[in-house]
């Protein structure tokens, strides 16, 4: 009987244990990673084995004792299985909240300045609730705070770190109030933390902003919203660039069409030329007195292609042009005095076959104008014309540019020594260097021309381009050969593009056979003066180098005073070096600013000696010697302003 009663009691206890009455939640000790992964967790259910054990025991009991109480005992299964029902596992519940509502991974949006990151050697995927509780208590003890004030915000598996924050003592549940990380770390007992939590292997405790800020910012950038923002920004940028390119292309097409229209409408009108009647028409057989015949007038119209079309009109219907040479305002290269293409074919430069340049009618007319044009201005007239800029512009447009046809220079490969392929030296006034050998004609070439001065003085100036890397030796050879006392440089080394190379040394340099020494440097307001000594063998020459740097890019100076002062200083040095060679003047191409300086210098001498000035004749004379001198109408006006400023300084006694 005792055996019959004891066995069911034992089965009852086993079923109670299987129902969870004595064991609390055994799955609390599962790893955090198992809960976090949201995968189904299979928990071993003790009740299944216990059920099997009970069934076996009952079968044995029935077999041995055959007691009528067997039916009553077998009914205990339903009572045992229904007592203390186990709730189904819900993965949405936080593992840390199941046993301790105060200990949970909160995942709150805490500012980076309030977050502390603790780096562990221990794998954080193995942390369960017990270990996290120990960790929180250890951190709280090291800070001297309550464990409830230490909050584990999240676990960072990639870097094996625990992110936590500390709340004030009066924090209410659900609030995100937290203390500053820097303030918390100042009160942290690091040694105590390592001693109290040795099993975690704490390697570093730092604010979140120094450890994870870059990662968070990168996560924000490559988030869905960040990706859309980048795509939108790139799309807007591409649209803007495309619109700018379209506008630029439309502007280029408009300028091209306007330029083509100007070329089509370009005409040169010559003054009427009386045509003599044929002798057979002028005489009558039976009369000694011949009536005067109204002379017919031949008008010659030269189209842009250089073809002459004669047109005969009666003199009574012919209107005389107020100017002997009138030209509509056109571009710089169209006014070059030649219809030959400006493109220089480098492959044809090596040809040694001699050729003869034939002047076209237009070139002959242009040269006649350059040699005869004149407009003498008194001092009062000079002041008046300076106030009328439109008159100066119209006058400038009538002056032929007189650029040189490349075929006129019979030197193979001379294009390698030209800075600009359309700016070439006039052959009649070209500076020829002494050849290194008889067969090397290229060694005699330099892009420079002798320029006549006041009263037609020969070789008063040399106008040349800014030296290039391969022409620096040629430049110094020319200065030595011509015994030039002064060099005037009116350009910077670079203005958007390279304008001139640095062709002088800092102290001493050797260029070919010429040694150059810098003996002194003087800084003035608008230019720098260098005293140079040139040596070749036992001979020496003293040269002054003026570097004018105040000329602005792509326009004329606002005031002519600095250039006028430079001109006066150069003129003083030239007079002190009487008997020596020409003054060398260069800018970049050797025609624009160079022409302004030389024209101003000649005009000032004329005003000083005669009391009048003929700027038109001066510029025409310069273009005969070197094509394109005084390159733009703005520079032509600037020359008149400089002459007017010089005139205002002359004494009233100067004869007009």
From Swiss-Prot:
Query: What InterPro entries does the annotation carry?
Result: Prot-tyrosine_phosphatase-like, PTP_cat, Tyr_Pase_AS, Tyr_Pase_cat, Tyr_Pase_dom, Tyr_Pase_KIM-con, Tyr_Pase_rcpt_R/non-rcpt_5
**Occurrences of domain Tyrosine-protein phosphatase (ranges):** 392-646
Q: Which residues lie on this side of the membrane: Cytoplasmic?
A: 248-656
Please give the superkingdom of this protein's source: Eukaryota
Regarding tissue, the record states: Expressed in the heart, brain, spleen, lung, liver, skeletal muscle, kidney and testis. Isoform alpha is expressed throughout the granular layer of the cerebellar but not within the Purkinje cells, also in the villi of the ileum and jejunum and both the villi and crypts of the duodenum. Isoform beta is expressed only in the Purkinje cells. Isoform gamma is expressed throughout the brain, the villi and crypts of the duodenum, jejunum and ileum and expressed at low levels in the proximal colon.
Question: Which keywords does UniProt give here?
Answer: Cell membrane, Cytoplasm, Glycoprotein, Hydrolase, Membrane, Phosphoprotein, Protein phosphatase, Proteoglycan, Receptor, Signal, Transmembrane, Transmembrane helix
According to the UniProt entry, its GO molecular function terms are: protein kinase binding; protein tyrosine phosphatase activity
The annotated region (Disordered) lies at 269-289
Q: Ranges of Polar residues compositional bias?
A: 274-289
Glycosylation sites per record: 23, 128
Q: Which reaction does it catalyse?
A: O-phospho-L-tyrosyl-[protein] + H2O = L-tyrosyl-[protein] + phosphate
Q: Which residues form the active site?
A: 587 (phosphocysteine intermediate)
Task: List all membrane-crossing ranges.
Answer: 227-247
Q: Which GO terms describe its biological process?
A: ERBB2 signaling pathway; in utero embryonic development; negative regulation of epithelial cell migration; negative regulation of ERK1 and ERK2 cascade
The residues that the entry says bind substrate are: 553, 587-593, 631
What cellular component GO annotations does this protein have?
A: cell junction; cytosol; plasma membrane
Q: Where is the signal peptide?
A: 1-23
Residues bearing Phosphoserine are 271, 338
Entry's EC annotation: 3.1.3.48
Which segments does the topology annotation call Extracellular?
Answer: 24-226
Q: Which Gene3D superfamilies match?
A: Protein tyrosine phosphatase superfamily
Q: What does this protein do?
A: Sequesters mitogen-activated protein kinases (MAPKs) such as MAPK1, MAPK3 and MAPK14 in the cytoplasm in an inactive form. The MAPKs bind to a dephosphorylated kinase interacting motif, phosphorylation of which by the protein kinase A complex releases the MAPKs for activation and translocation into the nucleus. Isoform gamma may have a role in patterning and cellular proliferation of skeletal elements in the precartilaginous/cartilaginous skeleton.
Question: What family is reported?
Answer: Belongs to the protein-tyrosine phosphatase family. Receptor class 7 subfamily.
| Assembly notes | Interacts with MAPKs.
Protein name per UniProt: Receptor-type tyrosine-protein phosphatase R
Q: What is the lineage of its organism?
A: Eukaryota, Metazoa, Chordata, Craniata, Vertebrata
């Amino acid at each position: 009987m005792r055996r019959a009663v004891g066995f069911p009691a034992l089965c009852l206890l086993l079923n109670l244990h299987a129902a969870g009455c004595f064991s609390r939640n055994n799955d609390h000790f599962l790893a955090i990673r198992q809960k976090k992964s949201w995968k189904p967790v299979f928990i071993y259910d003790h009740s299944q084995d216990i059920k099997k054990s009970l069934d076996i025991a009952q079968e044995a009991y029935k077999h041995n004792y055959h007691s009528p109480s067997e039916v009553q005992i077998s009914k205990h299964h339903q009572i045992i299985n229904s007592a203390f029902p186990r709730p189904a596992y819900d993965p949405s519940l936080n593992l840390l909240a199941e046993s301790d509502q105060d200990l949970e991974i909160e995942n709150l949006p805490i500012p980076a300045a309030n977050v502390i990151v603790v780096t562990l050697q221990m794998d954080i995927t193995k942390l369960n609730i017990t270990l996290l509780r120990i960790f929180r208590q250890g951190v709280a003890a090291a800070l001297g705070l309550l464990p409830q004030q230490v909050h584990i915000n999240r676990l960072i598996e990639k870097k094996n770190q625990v992110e936590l924050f500390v709340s004030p003592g009066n924090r209410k549940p659900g609030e995100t109030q937290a203390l500053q990380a820097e303030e918390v770390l100042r009160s942290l007992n690091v040694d105590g933390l390592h001693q109290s939590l040795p099993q975690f292997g704490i390697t570093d405790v730092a604010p979140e902003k120094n450890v994870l800020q870059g990662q968070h910012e990168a996560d924000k950038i490559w988030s869905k919203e960040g990706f859309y923002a980048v795509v939108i920004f790139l799309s807007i940028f591409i649209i803007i660039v495309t619109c700018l390119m379209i506008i630029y292309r439309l502007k280029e097409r408009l300028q091209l069409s306007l330029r083509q229209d100007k070329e089509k409408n370009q005409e040169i009108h010559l003054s009427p030329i009386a045509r003599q009647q044929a002798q057979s028409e002028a005489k009558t057989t039976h009369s000694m007195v011949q009536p005067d015949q109204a002379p017919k007038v031949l008008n010659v119209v030269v189209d842009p292609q250089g073809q002459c079309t004669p047109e005969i009109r009666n003199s009574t219907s012919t209107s005389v042009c107020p100017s002997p040479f009138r030209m509509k305002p056109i571009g710089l290269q169209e006014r070059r005095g030649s219809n030959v293409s400006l493109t220089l074919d480098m492959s044809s430069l090596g040809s040694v076959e001699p050729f003869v340049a034939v002047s076209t009618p237009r070139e002959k007319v242009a040269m006649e104008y350059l040699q005869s044009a004149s407009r003498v201005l008194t001092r009062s007239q000079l002041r008046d014309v300076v106030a009328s800029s439109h008159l100066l512009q119209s006058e400038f447009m009538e002056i032929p540019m007189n650029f040189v046809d490349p075929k006129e220079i019979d030197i193979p490969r001379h294009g390698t020594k030209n800075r600009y392929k359309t700016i070439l030296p006039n052959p009649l006034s070209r500076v020829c260097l002494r050849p290194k050998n008889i067969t090397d004609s290229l060694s005699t070439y330099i892009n420079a021309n002798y320029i006549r001065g006041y009263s037609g003085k020969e070789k008063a100036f040399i106008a040349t381009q800014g030296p290039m890397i391969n022409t620096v030796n040629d430049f110094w050879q020319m200065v030595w050969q011509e015994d030039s006392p002064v060099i005037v440089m009116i350009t910077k080394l670079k203005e958007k593009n390279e304008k001139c190379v640095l062709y002088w040394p800092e102290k001493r340099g050797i260029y070919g056979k010429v040694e150059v020494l810098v003996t002194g440097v003087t800084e003035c307001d608008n230019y720098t003066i260098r005293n140079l000594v040139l040596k070749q063998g036992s001979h020496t020459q003293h040269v002054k180098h003026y570097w004018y740097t105040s000329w602005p890019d792509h326009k004329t100076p606002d005031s002519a005073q600095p250039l006028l002062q430079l001109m006066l200083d150069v003129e003083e040095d030239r007079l002190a070096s009487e008997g020596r060679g020409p003054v060398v003047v260069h800018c970049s191409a050797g025609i624009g600013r160079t022409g302004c300086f030389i024209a101003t210098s000649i005009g000032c001498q004329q005003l000083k000696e005669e009391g009048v000035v003929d700027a038109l004749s001066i510029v025409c004379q310069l273009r005969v010697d070197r094509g394109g001198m005084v390159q733009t109408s703005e520079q032509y006006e600037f020359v008149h302003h400089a002459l007017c400023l010089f005139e205002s300084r002359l004494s009233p006694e100067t004869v007009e």
